[in-house]
Amino acid sequence: MARVTYYGTGRRKNAIARVRLVPGEGNITINKRNIEEYFNYETLRRDVRLPLELTETLSQFDVLATVNGGGYTGQAGALRHGIARALLKADDELRPALKKAGYLTRDSRMKERKKYGLKGARRAPQFSKR
């Protein structure tokens, strides 16, 4: 018999996370590594677990995720988004709680591009009056 699997895709900045939720005891595996090995900071680990803790499903599902692109913070945000979307497929009644917490909303803030004539996105070259 095939195992029940729920899929979700999360994005944040340049990071994309493909998340699978499988009934289990709460193990989180990211790119074939444990969450403690993958994220060095507890704040990032907590950020990934937030949707599961909010819906009280942390001990019901194992999370298997593949994430690439971006930095650690972007990847953690992408995982949070992907887990929330997968939880929604598992149980549609979780939508109000996840929506209220803002976990279903894609954070659209992106890095602003560098403009010509400037040192960065907005930083202008030093100005000398004389």
Swiss-Prot record:
GO biological process terms, semicolon-separated: translation
A Pfam family this chain is assigned to: Ribosomal_S9
UniProt-annotated stretches for the region Disordered: 109-130
InterPro entries listed in its UniProt record: Ribosomal_Su5_D2-typ_SF (IPR020568), Ribosomal_uS9 (IPR000754), Ribosomal_uS9_bac/plastid (IPR023035), Ribosomal_uS9_CS (IPR020574), Ribsml_uS5_D2-typ_fold_subgr (IPR014721)
One Gene Ontology term, aspect cellular component: cytosolic small ribosomal subunit
GO terms of molecular function: RNA binding; structural constituent of ribosome
Biased composition (Basic residues): 111-130
Keyword terms: Ribonucleoprotein, Ribosomal protein
HAMAP family for this protein: Ribosomal_uS9_B
Family in the record: Belongs to the universal ribosomal protein uS9 family.
NCBIfam families: PRK00132.1
UniProt name for this protein: Small ribosomal subunit protein uS9
Lineage, highest ranks first: Bacteria, Bacillati, Bacillota, Clostridia, Peptostreptococcales
